[in-house]
From Swiss-Prot:
CC terms in the record's Gene Ontology section: cytoplasm
UniProt xrefs under Gene3D superfamilies: 3.10.50.40, Trigger factor ribosome-binding domain, Trigger factor, C-terminal domain
Protein's recorded name: Trigger factor
Gene: tig
Natural source organism: Deinococcus deserti (strain DSM 17065 / CIP 109153 / LMG 22923 / VCD115)
GO molecular-function terms, A-Z: peptidyl-prolyl cis-trans isomerase activity; protein folding chaperone; ribosome binding
Entry keyword set: Cell cycle, Cell division, Chaperone, Cytoplasm, Isomerase, Rotamase
Any single GO BP term: protein transport
């Protein structure tokens, strides 16, 4: 049960009491998981006494697992019960005891008051690209190119050939060069040459990563020359791609292109509508909210660099040396503001449209998301944490509000929310929740 204690401006405080029965159930679930996962010498899996398991993992660990499980469920539920859209929150849990109620206090900030302009008569102008015969034929040509074969020839190198070269020198290697996509200085040096020729390639000064490379010369030997062989567009070509005929390949390809075009048009109309909302909304956005989102986005960038083996300090130094750091930071702040405004507009839209997502619907979506990521619902909940779960719920509400509004609008093409668009939303929800959590 949730009780609102105070609300001043966008700052709120509320108290949540979890019944003893729910606490007992959480304890049982945690003990069941520990009995399954903790291996104790001398006992079969699941047969070790709780006291023995507690001795191995510690009483504090058990209590923390129970506390986390309760918060992951009851904090988001309380926020929904009180109809609070929280930007951020601090949770203060009280003592936890089996067989007794568990209480916790929450202090947080809600989104600021927002007023949206009238959008009911908006005519969306974005359209889906037209799939003409020319578009289809170009796509078929691309398929031919991707499935081309190469045969060795005894003649001078031509513009569409594949050339195998051996770089001379201690660090040299052998590798293929596709002239139709090669850089100009490589292509120009090789055109007209023959197998067995030794060629000097002048590489212009360039920058690679954070290193500057002066102009230099590379000596290579031409080991082989191959000409590109395109398969004829016929039933045999279609069969090589597991289609029964060329007509069937063309039909399936057109359907796929039309599906992508429809999706592109839908996405364009979504962005057009959101841009309309944010441009005309009125809201006093606290600077702290913008700064918090900017910091969250900066953390995302640092995490991404870290996964690539790059330290932020190194990247920052590189940006300074290039004179681009100020521009980078300005763009980051601008993008943070755009994200905040988008969320605020869609939160208000959901409120105006009285959009609701039931606990059953939300739990089903969480289960589907967990399965898509190879996790159990419990693992996903733990990974997201209480704030992340709340943000994930908010993202679902925002998406539903956007779909509902678009369905009401008329334009060059009426909005229909495709099933595959919903699947895309599910794939991106976890990342969205993690970003929104900040």
């Amino acid at each position: 049960m949730a009780e609102l204690i105070s609300r001043e401006g966008n700052k709120v405080e509320f108290k949540v009491a979890v019944p003893a029965a729910e606490v007992n159930r959480a304890y049982e679930q945690v003990w069941a998981g520990l009995a399954r996962d903790v291996r104790v010498p001398g006992f079969r899996p699941g047969k070790a006494p709780r006291k023995v398991i507690e001795g191995r993992v510690g009483k504090g660990y058990v209590e923390q697992e129970v506390r986390d499980r309760l918060l992951q469920v009851h904090y988001p539920q309380a926020a929904r019960e009180l109809k609070l859209s929280l930007v951020d929150a601090t949770i203060d849990p009280q003592d936890l005891n089996n067989g007794k109620d568990f209480t916790f206090n929450v202090r947080g900030e809600t989104y600021p008051e927002v007023t949206l302009g009238d959008w009911s008569d908006l005519k969306l102008e974005a359209t889906s690209p037209e799939i003409t015969d020319d578009v289809l034929n170009r796509t078929l040509s691309d398929l031919q190119e991707r499935n081309a074969t190469f045969e060795s020839v005894d003649r001078a190198i031509e513009a569409s050939d594949q050339v195998t070269i051996e770089e001379q020198g201690e660090d040299g290697g052998t590798y293929p060069v596709y002239l139709d996509v090669a850089e100009a200085h490589v292509r120009d040096a090789l055109l007209g040459k023959n197998k067995g020729d030794t060629v000097e390639i002048t590489v212009p000064a360039h920058q690679h990563g954070d290193h500057e490379h002066a102009e230099h010369t590379v000596t290579v030997k031409i080991m082989d020359v191959k000409t590109k062989q395109l398969q004829e567009l016929n039933d045999e070509f279609a069969s090589s791609l597991n289609f029964e005929s060329l007509d069937r390949l063309r039909a399936d390809l057109r359907n796929e292109l039309q599906r992508r075009a429809q999706q592109e048009g839908d996405n364009a109309r979504r962005e057009e509508f959101v841009a309309h909302l944010t441009e005309r909304m009125q809201a006093d956005i606290p600077q702290a909210l913008l700064e918090r989102r900017r910091e969250a986005m900066m953390q995302e960038i640092q995490d991404d660099l870290s996964r690539q083996g790059v330290k932020w300090s190194e990247y920052e130094t590189f940006m300074k040396e290039q004179g681009k750091l100020d521009e980078f930071m300005a763009d980051l702040s601008k993008n943070a503001e755009t994200r905040v405004k988008r969320d605020l507009a869609l939160e208000k839209l959901a409120e105006d449209l009285k959009v609701q997502v039931s606990d059953a619907e939300f739990n089903q979506t969480m289960t589907m998301l967990a399965q898509a990521n190879g996790l159990s619902p419990e693992q996903l909940s733990k990974q997201l944490g209480p704030n992340g779960i709340n943000s994930y719920y908010a993202s679902i509400v925002r998406e539903r509000a956007l779909q509902q509004a678009l369905a009401q609008l008329s334009g060059p093409q009426a909005e229909t929310v495709a099933a595959d668009q919903g699947e895309q939303q599910a794939e991106g929800q976890e990342e969205s929740a993690e970003k929104s959590e900040e």
